[in-house]
Structure formats: C-alpha cells, structure tokens
C-alpha cells in the first residue's frame, strides 16, 4: 500500500481517546476524595540520583502539581471496574495489546498558575521501564483553561478530553501537560504493562 499524499495526511499523535470511562458522579467523588479525604494531596516529586542513591525531590523545573494514591478501597474498586470494562477492551482492539499489569492509580490536581508537567517520557528510568501505555482520565473538563496534553514530536495539536474520558498513549512518546491558566485541572492517571 502506498502512503497518502501529504495533502491528505494530518500529523497528529497516535493517541487513543476513550469516552465515558468514568461517569460524572465518579469524577466528582474522586475530586472530593483528593481534596477532602486526602488533604489536597502532596506536592509531586521526581526521582533523582544523588550520591549514588535514588531520592524523591520536588523540581518545579520539571513539574508542578499535587497528587495522591486513592485511600478509599471502594473508590479504587470502582475505578478498576470501569477501567476493565470500558478502557481495556479498546486498548486490545486498537493497539492489539493485552494489559497484564497496572501501576497504582494516582489522583492529580494541576492548580491555576502552578500546574504543569514539562515534556517527558514515562518509561525512561529503570524503575518505570516496564511501562508500555499511560492512561489519563480527565475529571473536570470545562472548569479550567490550559492544562492540555501536547505531543511535541507530532505537531502543535492539543488534547483535552471531556470529563470522564481517557487518553491512552505509548509511554515512549514525548508529551507534556501545558500550564493551567485558570481553575484547577483534576485527573486520574495510571500506567499499563
């Protein structure tokens, strides 16, 4: 098969968008859990090598957000069930990939004028080399501006899925979360292998 002429192609990142992974009520419950039950989360850190040892360190030159692992087993079970029922079948269908492992869920908050994650890959260090796909569910589209995903190797296109929808993409793809300009962007993320 011959490639399409340039006029018929669009340079866009190979990202799977899955609508309705979480329903709005679950999204609202996850935001409440992060803000109330988990005290707003902790400042997100990055893993660095220091004096021959791996350490977590806050580095606003790389990312700035709050995060927590869910502390409510019932909420976590609801998230897992929806992932199994709504997202994983699409990953098999589109990427021909059978998920066998999932990293812990993380709830994220990207606050106004202080929420971003500069361009990075999700599987570059030995502790995360097992990761194959990232999955991120937007929890409150429309309550903020900015905060879109961008894949700079594939052009300027921005991705901001609706509330409850997921983006799934290869952990090897360079990507960023652009700065949040107004409001707070909430999301849930995990990594699949």
Task: Locate the predicted segments by residue.
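Fe(II)/2-oxoglutarate oxygenase catalytic core
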Residues: 1-134, 138-166, 172-193
